[in-house]
């Protein structure tokens, strides 16, 4: 008869294969992330994104409600600063919405995109956010701080990226304050060259937020234990080619990547089914 320890190990191992995370909250290159930079298809996406947004609204009620709230806020604040050429209301609304309540579900779906690409109902939102950061980024580098109640781990080898949009602040005291940081999680000290200062596009201007795109790669990583928390310094930022590009624009390249994503999704589905069957059989085998 299989022991409870064996059942636990089997369940744990298969779960790790499905999620693609060997260790929870591992700091790595986020291999499952949707990291589209929309290089070469901005014009196409500008035409297609409004339709994609409506499709996402039909499938994602939370996004629809948060977007409608953000539209109202954006109309109130959009004349408080000047914006670069090409920046429009969709970009501003997306940034405001992100600083609300939708960022958690968006980031979870973005980081684990390859596991279930067919259930990603943030297509236009991701595009507008990404494009907004590209337009607002002045190509200058800045040091920022990101506090989280999660304890991250790093293997000590290789470059890393967040794999999702990452909020940070120019003000260390903001990053280390509640509710962002409880003193037992992780404090990131980041040098970002692709992050954009979005203070004037936020519900919370006092946070001095700098939003970092998930595709920014950091080649120098230093970790240390400080009192009860982990401090991680990320430096030597670079912009590298993404695994996805123009995924929703309908281009040939997008179709090729889509096929890859579908194959990986099938493998994940198979492992989920296998997990359920094995656990069921082990349970039935007990006297």
UniProtKB/Swiss-Prot annotation:
Active site residues of this protein: 146, 167, 209
A GO biological process held by the record: NAD catabolic process
Mod. after translation: It is proposed that in the absence of reducing agents, a disulfide bond is formed between Cys-80 and Cys-201, leading to a conformational change that reduces the catalytic rate of NAD glycohydrolysis.
Site-annotated residues for Required for the thiol-dependency of NADase activity: 80, 201
Covalently attached lipid (GPI-anchor amidated serine), positions: 258
Glycosylation, residue list: 171, 256
Catalytic activity: L-arginyl-[protein] + NAD(+) = N(omega)-(ADP-D-ribosyl)-L-arginyl-[protein] + nicotinamide + H(+); NAD(+) + H2O = ADP-D-ribose + nicotinamide + H(+)
Limits of the TR mART core domain: 61-241
GO MF annotation: an example: NAD+ nucleosidase activity
GO cellular component, one term: external side of plasma membrane
InterPro entries for this protein: ADP-ribosyltransferase_ARG (IPR050999), ART (IPR000768)
Prodomain residues: 259-287
Effect of residue 26 to T: In strain: NZW and C57BL/6
Pfam family, one: ART
Family as reported in the entry's similarity comment: Belongs to the Arg-specific ADP-ribosyltransferase family.
Involvement in disease: A subset of Rt6+ regulatory T-cells may confer protection to autoimmune disease, and failure to develop this subset may result in enhanced susceptibility for autoimmune disease.
Entry protein name: T-cell ecto-ADP-ribosyltransferase 1
Gene name as annotated: Art2a
